[in-house]
């Protein structure tokens, strides 16, 4: 994000209110191109034969948009489906401009982040981006809580809701008009079945900008309700948006006055100073030390917030009330739970000795072994029972490439699940990947696994055994014994900014 300040060279007032002219600036699309939103091939290529993008394509596309809008009145034309600007086989212009538009709309969010960091005196915020940074917070604060609300945040059902929400963050009317055109035109040629896959796979940045603006509005009101219901109001309401694209939010609440007054009369009855809120992957957790009536009250507030402010119908099962000690949470690829660990303490007074049972509350994180094996089976590393099989599609690669790919997956999983308190599940995953690699190599050479390993030597798959130790030796180089002890403990890394594909159970060949 630091590139924006170098490329844009605009003051803050200009970035807030004059975003529309940036659509015609070539470096905006160069930024979107350099970010590598599409891994295989950029959408900004003029055609397959030219490795460059053209600003002229962008200008021509925008000119056609407004000519089309003036001629056909796209918001009110009855024959809209027959007069589409973006046809079913011509989504090139939509992709190109939407990704550039997403880069531009990110500017107000980034400025709010800079202002928030300056006020709080935070020089570097890279560590806050790490997914692992949330687990130490949970360990420190969730162990003494009792109830938890598991909330599935609803998506806006109407396009105008997204536009009205984004209006609070982007003050440029021309950009909002262009966004309205994008969304209505997009809806006209995409069926409901195609919409989610199109946004998630081809327009990720555009999707997250819209989603984050919706989340900002939703959580601003929630922070207000939280402060009104607490004896000690929080001094900072800075929250993190989706960590794929990281922003911060100021202590600036965009509220509807009528909505605030409607809830303020009853909030004083339920004071709860012990409450923590965490959001991840379209879900959120509200943990409290309160009582069941208090949690039901918050459920009532959330349902009314969605229906009254965002016009969203709350479906059954979107909010679940559970006891933290009796239920586990599927959180960012881990299975987390808060339980009581028994601890025996021997106490002696004069000649009498006593053994005291002193259970300790502990927030634990485990590897979800069953879903992880299911992901490995989906990627054809093993069958549904966890028995390793050969990766047939990789047999055309060289031996070194096959070993490197398997080793990279093994290291990434070990790195991501380093915070697990039980490493035995990781040993099983390593065994599956190691044997799958051996069977893939044996299949390539038309041999058995035993014969291939005997011919190649035992050091062929050595990197599977030493991957974690090498990482720990680099981190703690003083003594090998220290590394072995740390390997058995939980380690949270601050360089993990996205969930491993296997952990999120969404596999594809881009895993490696």
Curated annotation (Swiss-Prot):
GO terms for molecular function: RNA binding. Its main location: plastid. GO terms for biological process: mRNA processing; RNA splicing; tRNA processing. The keyword Plastid applies. GO terms for cellular component: chloroplast. Keywords: Chloroplast, mRNA processing, Plastid, RNA-binding, tRNA processing. It is found in: Plastid, Chloroplast. It comes from the Eukaryota. Usually encoded in the trnK tRNA gene intron. Probably assists in splicing its own and other chloroplast group II introns. Belongs to the intron maturase 2 family. MatK subfamily. This is Maturase K.
């Amino acid at each position: 994000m630091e590139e924006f300040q170098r490329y844009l060279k605009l003051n803050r007032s200009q970035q807030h209110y004059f975003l529309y002219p940036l659509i015609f600036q070539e470096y905006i699309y160069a930024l979107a191109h350099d970010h590598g939103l599409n891994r295989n091939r950029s959408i900004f290529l003029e055609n397959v034969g030219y490795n460059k993008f053209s600003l002229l394509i962008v200008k021509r596309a925008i000119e056609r948009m407004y000519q089309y809008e003036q001629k056909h009145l796209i918001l009110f034309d009855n024959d809209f489906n027959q007069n589409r600007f973006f046809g079913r086989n011509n989504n090139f212009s939509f992709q190109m401009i939407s990704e550039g538009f997403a880069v531009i709309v990110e500017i107000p969010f980034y400025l709010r982040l800079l202002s928030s960091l300056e006020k709080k005196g935070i020089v570097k915020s890279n560590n806050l981006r790490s997914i692992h940074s949330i687990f130490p917070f949970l360990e420190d604060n969730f162990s003494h809580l009792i109830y938890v609300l598991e909330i599935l945040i609803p998506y806006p059902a109407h396009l105008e809701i997204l536009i009205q929400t984004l209006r609070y963050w982007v003050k440029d009317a021309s950009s909002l008009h262009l966004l309205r055109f994008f969304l209505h035109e997009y809806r006209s040629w995409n069926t409901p079945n195609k919409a989610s896959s199109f946004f998630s796979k081809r327009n990720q940045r555009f999707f997250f900008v819209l989603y984050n603006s919706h989340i900002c509005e939703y959580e601003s009101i929630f922070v207000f309700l939280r402060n009104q219901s607490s004896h000690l109001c929080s001094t900072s309401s800075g929250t993190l948006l989706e960590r794929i694209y990281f922003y911060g939010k100021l202590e600036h609440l965009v509220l509807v006055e009528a909505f605030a007054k409607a809830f303020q009369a009853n909030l004083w009855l339920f004071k709860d100073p012990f409450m923590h809120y965490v959001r991840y992957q379209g879900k959120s957790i509200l943990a409290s030390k309160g009582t069941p009536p208090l949690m039901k009250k918050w459920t009532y507030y959330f349902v009314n917030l969605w229906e009254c402010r965002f016009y969203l119908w709350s479906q059954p099962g979107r909010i679940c009330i559970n006891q933290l000690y009796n239920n586990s949470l599927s959180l960012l690829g881990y299975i987390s739970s808060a339980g009581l660990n028994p601890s025996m303490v021997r106490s002696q007074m004069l000649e009498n000795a006593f053994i005291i049972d002193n259970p300790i509350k502990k927030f634990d994180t485990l590897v979800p072994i069953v879903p992880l094996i299911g992901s490995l089976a989906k990627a054809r590393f093993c069958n549904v029972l966890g028995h390793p099989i050969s990766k047939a599609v990789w047999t055309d690669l060289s031996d070194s490439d096959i070993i490197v790919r398997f080793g990279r997956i093994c290291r990434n999983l070990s790195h991501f699940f380093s915070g697990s308190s039980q490493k035995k599940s990781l040993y099983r995953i390593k065994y599956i990947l190691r044997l799958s690699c051996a069977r893939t190599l044996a299949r390539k050479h038309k041999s058995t696994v035993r014969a291939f390993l005997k011919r190649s030597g035992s050091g062929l798959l050595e990197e599977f055994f030493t991957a974690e130790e090498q990482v720990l030796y680099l981190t703690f180089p003083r003594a090998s014994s220290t590394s072995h002890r740390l390997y058995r403990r939980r380690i949270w890394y601050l360089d993990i900014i996205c969930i491993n594909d296997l952990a999120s159970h969404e596999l594809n060949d881009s895993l490696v």
